[in-house]
Amino acid sequence: VKKKRIILPTDFSNNAWNAIAYALTIFKDVPCDFFILNSYQVGASGLSTKMAGANDTRLYNLIKEQSDRDLKRELEKIKSFDKNPEHTFIARSIPDNLVNAIGKTVYREEIDYVIMGTKGASGLKEVFMGSNTYKVIKEVDFCPVIAVPDDYQIEKEIDAILLATGYEHLFENYELKPLLNFVEHFKAKLWIAHVGSLDALAPEQKASKKGLKNRLKSIDYEFIEVEKDTSVNNTIQQLVEKDKTIDMVVMINQNHTFFERLTREPVIKKVSFNSKVPFLVIHLFE
């Protein structure tokens, strides 16, 4: 069995730790290589003098040492939390912005998932990790990302997963794989929610739904039709609120999904900020 390779970004905040603990818990029986990644940037001071250059270098070295030190501490914490001998942990301290640091690592290390919190050290959701998580979802569009809400505690296995879709394209095996990994591993129920008007589906939507049926032969799934509430995001949140068994929401991100055309609503962005349960975004290679 090929080990799963997973990036866990951290800014050493409680929220970052919460996402790490979540990842270690859901993959507790799966052999994994975890890349614990901290990125940092030293802003140029704008003075093009030798002194400024020397200051930047000094600052850079200080920040780098701090990052290495904090990562070492984080690894010790992880190893006391996670005793699985089939889990390997690799610390990466990278002098770059978060999106680049993650993107390059995904590419070089053939990463399967990026799992990160939705709130960073600042505590304001839209600041740091908040907007960063969305940036990672948007820019690192060649790797599935799981955004873990800041106060989310996993209490049990994953019972049910909600895939929200507009049946806007024919599903390919590669895009369903990151979702089916969880469904199969946890023997979870898969709810496939079509959110929109309850009018009859267009022919291409029917084809998409039929294709999905063929791909899901061996698993426990059910289709549901949901009338769109004020927004797709609200509708999804209400479904999760109502059905307490849903432990993960999944969406496939196309450049402009059916949802976004239909509603002019940046659904993925909204759900990534508002979801009460972990949110898996899978990208479509167009």
Give the role of each language-model region.
Residues 229-242:
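A short, acidic, amphipathic alpha-helical segment used as a generic capping/interface helix at domain edges
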Residues 103-152, 240-286:
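Gly/Ser-rich helix-loop-strand patches that form or flank binding pockets
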Residues 72-76:
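N-terminal, Lys/Arg-enriched amphipathic/low-complexity engagement segments
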Residues 67, 111-114, 154-166:
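Conserved N-terminal glycine/acidic-rich loop preference
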Residues 90-101, 231-233:
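Charged docking surfaces used in two-component/phosphorelay signaling
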Residues 80-90, 217-224:
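A short helix-to-beta-strand connector/capping loop
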Residues 1-57, 160-226, 246, 274:
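Small/aliphatic-rich secondary-structure junction motif
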Residues 55-69:
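A short acidic, glycine-rich active-site loop
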